[in-house]
Design a protein with these regions (language model features):
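Active-site microenvironments in enzyme catalytic cores
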Residues: 1-123
Length: 123
């Protein structure tokens, strides 16, 4: 039903930390037994997805889109990002809200930024 029910992701700038920082295991609702009500416990199934982060340099006016052909002119550089997920909490909260609290507790980011200029020879 993902075509008909909007899914919201929730994140905070304050949850972005440098890779290597200790991550506190999140707590949330979990319902492992369908016969019992959900319980509020620490996550038991924690993982992360490796992603590519982009640093935007040149800005644009608020509310003004950037044409796809001009997008690269606005990118300063890239870095590796780990998007952490509390999968057991996510399984419970996913419908109808989407992965809200299960994905908002931590994002780790590489301390290194590779500029687009440095990547040019590898295009």
């Amino acid at each position: 039903n993902y075509k008909y029910i909007p899914i919201g992701y929730h994140g905070r700038a304050s949850s972005i930390v440098i890779s290597g920082t200790d991550i506190k295991r999140p707590r949330g609702q979990n319902r492992s037994d369908a016969e019992k009500p959900p319980v509020f416990i620490p996550c038991k199934n924690l993982d992360y997805e490796m992603e590519l982060g982009f640093f935007v340099g040149k800005g644009n006016e608020l509310g003004q889109p950037i044409d796809i052909k001009d997008a690269e002119d606005h990118i300063f550089g890239v870095c590796l990002v780990n998007d952490w997920s509390a999968r057991d909490i996510q399984a419970w909260e996913y419908q109808p809200l989407g992965p809200f609290l299960s994905k908002s507790f931590a994002t780790t980011i590489s301390p290194y930024v590779v500029t687009m200029e440095a990547l040019a020879p590898f295009r």
